[in-house]
Amino acid sequence: MVSITLKTNRIFRSCLNLATNLKFSITLFIIICIVSAIGTIIPQDKPKEFYMNTYSLKVLGMPLWKIIQLLSLEKIFYSNFYLILLLCLSFSLFFCSLKSQFPYLRTSRIIKLNNNNPPTSPLHESKKIKYNNIASKNDSSCVQLVSQGYKIYTFDKNLDKAGPLLIHLSLILILLGSAIHAFNDFIAQEMIPIYEVSHIQNVISSGRISKIPQTISLKASAFTVEHENEKVVKQFITNLAMLNSKGEVLKQGLVSVNHPLVYKQVYIFQMDWKLFGIRVNYGKNKIYEFPVQKIEANNEQQWSCTIPAKNQSKLILIFKNMSDEFYVYDNNQNFLKIGKINTPQLIRNTYFTVISKISGTGLQIKKDSSINIVYTGFLLLIIGLVINHKGSKKRT
């Protein structure tokens, strides 16, 4: 039993020495940087078909997309390997702080002032004194002279010593926040038609223990577009409400790209929009809904809709962006006229009115439970760097 205990202690000390080794921490940091760079080069969380089409090149007789999936490079920031690296670096910084930074901060800088020629009556008590020639060199440092026999030391209790410790602590918080994000958070995208209620279903990425809120639903009551001019879109804005299972409003507000709706660490951003169809009135309250198809032309978002006309003919309506105007063509793609929403049209003996467009808002829903931890880490990192820089200038 004693030998087993000794071996266990040796193994523990070896692991502790390795964790507090500066070269080990730097090696881990370099590996994390390389892995993160790979994650930025290879698109993350894409459908399988995307990787099959993009990485069809064969390497050593195997398609590259299979190698990517085999090594989990398509979700590298959620892989076990990446999480283990983050945790190892966090533990390394933590134990290094306990072993080196705290004792360094506690003992401060020690300077031996006298070692020879012992005085006739040596001092035996510690005294805090104002020593002008020392204090002038150390600015606001608290200088304490301590006698020990015939030897006199100064303890320079300086705030500059806290810089490296704050940097270590900030890095630990940032890494811890990243690990929590990888385990507990999720990202989803939803395209919600206006006036309809939708649940969070289209999950793009999620952590191992993350839970998708099934009791929360989303309802978009309005969607508008702000323009800088007639052709340039400034931003999209959605009037969005979060509902509980009983249909009661939990939170409501305007959502845009830079102004999310936040509820219990769930952030909802405006991402995109889509046109689903149009409503057409043929008179006498005969209202029909027709789907639209998206087409690309001249770097503009356009939608095409075919509606029936008299004499078994058809009319083609083209909508551009979010404009209230539409272009009318016949079966042979001959341009007929420009119409407007809520304005009656009489074309080829067909009387109709386009009442409204059925649009939808594209939202990105993400849970970010570690954002406060990460922000605190970056704040401490800035403070630590400022203190460390100030201390280095003093010493020079």
From Swiss-Prot:
Could you tell me where this protein is found in the cell? Answer: Plastid, Chloroplast thylakoid membrane
Q: Which InterPro entries match?
A: Cyt_c_bgen_Ccs1/CcsB/ResB, ResB-like_domain
Q: Which residues cross the membrane?
A: 22-42, 79-99, 162-182
* Membrane topology designation: Multi-pass membrane protein
Q: What Pfam families does the database record attribute to this sequence?
A: ResB
GO terms (BP aspect): cytochrome complex assembly
Q: What GO CC annotations are associated with the protein?
A: chloroplast thylakoid membrane
Q: Which UniProt keywords apply?
A: Chloroplast, Cytochrome c-type biogenesis, Membrane, Plastid, Thylakoid, Transmembrane, Transmembrane helix
Question: Assembly and partners?
Answer: May interact with CcsA.
Q: Which family does it belong to?
A: Belongs to the Ccs1/CcsB family.
Q: Per its database record, what is this protein's job?
A: Required during biogenesis of c-type cytochromes (cytochrome c6 and cytochrome f) at the step of heme attachment.
Could you tell me what this protein is called?
Answer: Cytochrome c biogenesis protein Ccs1
What organism is recorded for this protein?
Cyanidium caldarium
- The gene is ccs1
